[in-house]
UniProtKB/Swiss-Prot annotation:
<feature type="active site" description="Proton donor">
    <location>
        <position position="221"/>
    </location>
</feature>
<dbReference type="GO" id="GO:0046558">
    <property type="term" value="F:arabinan endo-1,5-alpha-L-arabinosidase activity"/>
</dbReference>
<feature type="active site" description="Proton acceptor">
    <location>
        <position position="38"/>
    </location>
</feature>
<keyword id="KW-0119">Carbohydrate metabolism</keyword>
<dbReference type="InterPro" id="IPR050727">
    <property type="entry name" value="GH43_arabinanases"/>
</dbReference>
<feature type="site" description="Important for substrate recognition and stabilization">
    <location>
        <position position="291"/>
    </location>
</feature>
<dbReference type="GO" id="GO:0005576">
    <property type="term" value="C:extracellular region"/>
</dbReference>
<feature type="binding site">
    <location>
        <begin position="90"/>
        <end position="92"/>
    </location>
    <ligand>
        <name>substrate</name>
    </ligand>
</feature>
<dbReference type="Pfam" id="PF04616">
    <property type="entry name" value="Glyco_hydro_43"/>
</dbReference>
<feature type="signal peptide">
    <location>
        <begin position="1"/>
        <end position="31"/>
    </location>
</feature>
<feature type="binding site">
    <location>
        <position position="221"/>
    </location>
    <ligand>
        <name>substrate</name>
    </ligand>
</feature>
<feature type="binding site">
    <location>
        <position position="316"/>
    </location>
    <ligand>
        <name>substrate</name>
    </ligand>
</feature>
<keyword id="KW-0378">Hydrolase</keyword>
<feature type="binding site">
    <location>
        <position position="175"/>
    </location>
    <ligand>
        <name>substrate</name>
    </ligand>
</feature>
<feature type="binding site">
    <location>
        <position position="35"/>
    </location>
    <ligand>
        <name>substrate</name>
    </ligand>
</feature>
<feature type="site" description="Important for catalytic activity, responsible for pKa modulation of the active site Glu and correct orientation of both the proton donor and substrate">
    <location>
        <position position="158"/>
    </location>
</feature>
<keyword id="KW-0106">Calcium</keyword>
Length: 347
């Protein structure tokens, strides 16, 4: 029969502190967390900058990646071409990516509407991310690519930039429809390179009987490619976002020795044929994990993503997790860090 041990004062005290720590992690002990969607980051000098979906693209700054201050919005008004591309555009610019190149910061962004591929990816450029600098000014360079219903079986949102071993810069993108694509950018990183070179890098099954104007059931989007060792790692979000507690977003990964693929999962299945190894899915406290980016800073690797907090009416929160690697070179994250990383938004 089981043996029962008395609960000592020390054991009770330890259990109480553990419960309090978990409660503080869940509620951030009263501190206001950073609520972001589709987060990407970069660093200028000793300051990190965080970019999020929102009106004009919301920008935050931090010295330690934990305490964040509102910095600016990249757009004071919507891009002049937005309503032409997407008549039902609501003013929220989606899914940015930020990329440094030859002394400039390139901020890519998406114009779209839910469930439609009346979409375009644009880019705006700045010399600095410090709004106090006299050189701070966003200059919109317009549309990089545009998707048109019935013409294109892809959706021009969710851009992410990667430079290959030869210095060639590529853009990955895509959401639902025919999956995730990759193409070469031209020298000034504002348009596809000519002659154009495009690749399909990941997709899920879609019925051939579905009308091309419909998003379909292939729940895949938000590619992000990280170079590590001998491989390019393609992260993607499967499932549905933006549904509070009903969100099914989760992260999968594959890898390739070529930036153009094929990207294979741990079983050897091509991500172009439905492959993808689970990286993180979340738990009862944190759901809808996805739309990640990934970085190497000061010799350490990090996964940046949003997660919906059940204890706060499923409001989206910033998460920055340590990215580890197993013996076979596959990325790993510790789900416990969803509780231990708690951002604070400073006034």
């Amino acid at each position: 029969m089981p043996t029962h041990h008395p609960i000592t004062r020390q054991h009770w005290h330890h259990s109480w502190l553990s419960a309090l720590a978990l409660l503080c992690a869940s509620l951030a002990c009263g501190a206001k967390q950073v609520d972001v969607h589709d987060p990407v980051m970069t660093r200028e000098g000793d300051t990190w900058y965080l970019f999020s979906t929102g009106p004009g693209i919301t920008i935050y700054s931090s010295k330690d990646r934990v305490n964040w201050r509102y910095s600016d919005r990249a757009f004071g008004t919507e891009p002049t071409w937005a309503k032409r591309v997407s008549p039902s555009f609501d003013g929220h610019l989606w899914a940015p990516d930020i990329y440094q190149h030859k002394g400039l910061f390139y901020l890519y962004y998406s114009v779209s509407a839910f469930g439609k591929n009346t979409s375009a990816i644009g880019v705006t450029v700045n010399k600095t991310l410090n709004p106090a600098s006299p050189d701070y000014r966003w200059e919109d360079k317009g549309i990089v690519i545009e998707s048109v219903p019935q013409r294109d079986l892809w959706n021009a949102i969710d851009p992410a930039i990667i430079a290959d071993d030869h210095g060639q810069v590529w853009m990955s993108f895509g959401s639902f429809w025919g999956g995730l694509k990759l193409f070469k950018l031209n020298d000034d990183l504002t348009r596809p390179a000519e002659p154009q070179e495009w690749h399909s890098i990941a997709k899920l099954e879609r019925s051939v009987l579905m009308d091309d104007s419909q998003a379909g059931s292939a729940q895949i989007e938000a590619p992000f490619i990280l170079r590590k060792g001998d491989y390019y790692y393609l992260f993607a979000s499967w499932g549905l976002c933006c549904r509070k507690g009903d969100s099914t977003y989760h992260l999968v990964v594959g890898r390739s020795k070529q930036v153009t693929g094929p990207y294979l999962d741990k079983t050897g299945r091509d991500m172009n044929q439905g492959g993808g190894s689970l990286l993180i899915k979340g738990n009862k406290r944190w759901v809808g994990l996805g739309h990640n980016s990934a970085y190497t800073w000061d010799g350490k690797d990090y996964l940046v993503l949003h997660a919906y907090e059940a204890a706060d009416n499923y409001l989206q929160k910033l998460k920055i997790l340590n990215l580890h690697w197993d013996g076979e070179g596959w990325p790993q994250v510790d789900e416990k860090e969803l509780d231990s990383y708690i951002s604070q938004r400073l006034k």
